[in-house]
Swiss-Prot record:
This is Enolase. GO terms for molecular function: magnesium ion binding; phosphopyruvate hydratase activity. The gene is eno. HAMAP family: Enolase. It comes from Chlamydia pneumoniae (Chlamydophila pneumoniae). Its cofactor is Mg(2+). SUPFAM superfamilies: Enolase C-terminal domain-like (SSF51604), Enolase N-terminal domain-like (SSF54826). Gene3D superfamilies: Enolase-like C-terminal domain, Enolase-like, N-terminal domain.
Amino acid sequence: MFEAVIADIQAREILDSRGYPTLHVKVTTSTGSVGEARVPSGASTGKKEALEFRDTDSPRYQGKGVLQAVKNVKEILFPLVKGCSVYEQSLIDSLMMDSDGSPNKETLGANAILGVSLATAHAAAATLRRPLYRYLGGCFACSLPCPMMNLINGGMHADNGLGFQEFMIRPIGASSIKEAVNMGADVFHTLKKLLHERGLSTGVGDEGGFAPNLASNEEALELLLLAIEKAGFTPGKDISLALDCAASSFYNVKTGTYDGRHYEEQIAILSNLCDRYPIDSIEDGLAEEDYDGWALLTEVLGEKVQIVGDDLFVTNPELILEGISNGLANSVLIKPNQIGTLTETVYAIKLAQMAGYTTIISHRSGETTDTTIADLAVAFNAGQIKTGSLSRSERVAKYNRLMEIEEELGSEAIFTDSNVFSYEDSEE
């Protein structure tokens, strides 16, 4: 192994896919190897997420600049980890967390800390001349994830009348990531044609999915079914449906209701949708505070549907352990910037997997062309990935990276058995 220590760290302000500033961090080692990371940012965020550092006292970018976070990288984090072995990921992450000193990384900013954390891993991989997935996952990193493709956007990701945030497809009948991407692209373009024929907008939302003005969530699901069929696939066999309700966005904390409905009624609505449509995954079907509701939702649908916690867990190992202990959900969405370091992200993945929960590596609505999450999905055999639609370069970059990894692996590549919660099985 080539010995290498951190020799330099540079950071600068760049723009994400929504036109807001974020960080680009570059770590250089004593051997001259370089690792880079570009940090994403979310629009729909959980209350217990690690906090970004934004220049709220400045008029630049409407108070969303990250110049102070850039300064924190250069003046605090770099001197702190300078000279550390680039392979000591957990040590470097611990030093940064200790220096920050807050439970949610608000002192220095999760965006600053994550940028250094991920760039360090890239630098280590570059020093060893290995791809990131192989450096992190070793020889067992050969499983490609089934993508969850967000084709219709609603909620906080679009300016339309849809209550739910994401209407996704899962190409469960694919035999490779290359075929899965092909299937998704076929449905995407078929859906675009259908929307155009109906005089509906084909403009896209933050995550590359269409954002038409539809009357109901059911209308969105019907359109997806029609697009799947017209593209030549069988719903529930070749391609299943998935939802991200982002229920916290329409939950009233004071009354404990969802647009006036109690959690039993909300669960009944979701259960009814699963009976009528080939839905095999529901994310954030209830609000993050509604533990009683989550327990019931998991009891009612957890045997046949993937019940995904995003805001519920925010990639936080403590919250994941609590959820496991209380029987909440059966799947964890993994977003590195929710927790703020690679070490904690990996721990969250392993905790979920050891408990028998499925895992989904996920992007954010404010993305860059950084493809780290594609490598993470393969490195830790996550099984699934959420990285948006089949449009917008910051989304497509992740699919392209996955196909590149599949080609690199050759005969060793395995496409994940994505029928863990298959619609067909639930019909038996």
